[in-house]
UniProtKB/Swiss-Prot annotation:
Record GO terms (molecular function): ATP binding; four-way junction DNA binding; four-way junction helicase activity
A single cellular component GO annotation: Holliday junction helicase complex
Subunit note: Homotetramer. Forms an RuvA(8)-RuvB(12)-Holliday junction (HJ) complex. HJ DNA is sandwiched between 2 RuvA tetramers; dsDNA enters through RuvA and exits via RuvB. An RuvB hexamer assembles on each DNA strand where it exits the tetramer. Each RuvB hexamer is contacted by two RuvA subunits (via domain III) on 2 adjacent RuvB subunits; this complex drives branch migration. In the full resolvosome a probable DNA-RuvA(4)-RuvB(12)-RuvC(2) complex forms which resolves the HJ.
UniProt gene name: ruvA
UniProt organism field: Bacillus cereus (strain G9842)
Example of a GO biological process term: DNA repair
Locations listed in the record: Cytoplasm
Organism placement in taxonomy: Bacteria, Bacillati, Bacillota, Bacilli, Bacillales
Domain free text: Has three domains with a flexible linker between the domains II and III and assumes an 'L' shape. Domain III is highly mobile and contacts RuvB.
Region (Domain I): 1-62
Region Domain III: start-end pairs: 153-205
Entry keywords, A to Z: Cytoplasm, DNA damage, DNA recombination, DNA repair, DNA-binding
UniProt-annotated stretches for the region Domain II: 63-141
Record's function text: The RuvA-RuvB-RuvC complex processes Holliday junction (HJ) DNA during genetic recombination and DNA repair, while the RuvA-RuvB complex plays an important role in the rescue of blocked DNA replication forks via replication fork reversal (RFR). RuvA specifically binds to HJ cruciform DNA, conferring on it an open structure. The RuvB hexamer acts as an ATP-dependent pump, pulling dsDNA into and through the RuvAB complex. HJ branch migration allows RuvC to scan DNA until it finds its consensus sequence, where it cleaves and resolves the cruciform DNA.
Protein name as it appears in the record: Holliday junction branch migration complex subunit RuvA
Amino acid sequence: MFEYVTGYVEYVGPEYVVIDHNGIGYQIFTPNPYVFQRSKQEIRVYTYHYVREDIMALYGFKTREERLLFTKLLGVSGIGPKGALAILASGQTGQVVQAIEHEDEKFLVKFPGVGKKTARQMILDLKGKLADVVPDAFVDLFSDTERFDEKKGTSAELDEALEALRALGYAEREVSRVVPELLKESLTTDQYIKKALSLLLNGKR
């Protein structure tokens, strides 16, 4: 089991990043790959090594707490790695925990791949068991007020963001519905993803 991988970001795509560590490139699937930027600065990614008969993959996270919630979600029947990543990519960690504790199925079914049965299973399996997942400990990667001083998004960034949404499991009709709102903004890829997920989870679907 790998605890974490340190290295340099060599590639960022809709589903994963590639971290170069001593000449070896690690393909790591993450909730929102675009929070990572290619640079000469070494980073640390906390990892989860997922092994099944037909698949072996590394999943990566900014914090141990984020990884902990991912592993707890994997323990719920009906939720696989892709579904767990989609939930984490929303940036609504606190709301997810609150929804589980308050048995708010209507909020949980907003995530791709989560129907009423799975939402109910999440509540049954996780309610009262998330005390060690502290939302305040999460790095706030999804703040609507986050802005870079100089870098602004272009149409290329928007295209990348839409591909990332599709990779998370959102249907084309859902993606299309948020495009008009996104076209009003000039953001980075990461910021477009955050904005789109905020719109999707707040009813514009």
